[in-house]
């Protein structure tokens, strides 16, 4: 029936999104096989320059599928899910959804700051988890290369971040690389060693081999990736948005923030409407 067809579609969407990166998959499902997800080569996923034309084609395909479901034939729970998916679709149709203003890097919560934490806290439940973790370290140079290409394009388009933000990211990269000359004492290696010692998944010989592999990957992949990112950002320094008002003064700045308000906060009001509301106590309560 309609509920079964809709549930199959939702499960397919879930599979697609949760397998977009090994980090997402690992932190979402403890046992991917229980949801029919087979092991694959672990990667951080892709970072690409936004392409509105191809994205619109994808959204059209999604809309065709979603509107094919008869809402009144769905269960109450599935009706709510359909409404949420349609709301998300409307958000993604907004011009700001593919804006180059979206910034994966940042001085406080950027990818370069989150990755060491995500990798250090990566749970080792099975031998496959450890193999995936090591594959992720190997994939980091490719992933950071994609990030660098995106930042270079942002610079060419005049929407690269300002020097204050860049300096903060570079400082974080430098702090991460502080122990690069002694990888055996780096935080990631120390944490990895402690987790292996607490695990019963490997023999002593296998643990030692994992530690050797981990140390080599830090030296050959992880540290060079962070150096490359730092060097690339240094070369782009001074080419970012320096004007007062920041990104909101860019050509599509307001449309981007309107998209963020609707997609991340669930607020349908425009930035201008919110500004007016915030100027009055009653307006603030109305939110």
Language-model regions, residue ranges each:
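N-terminal maturation segment of proteins
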Residues: 1-287
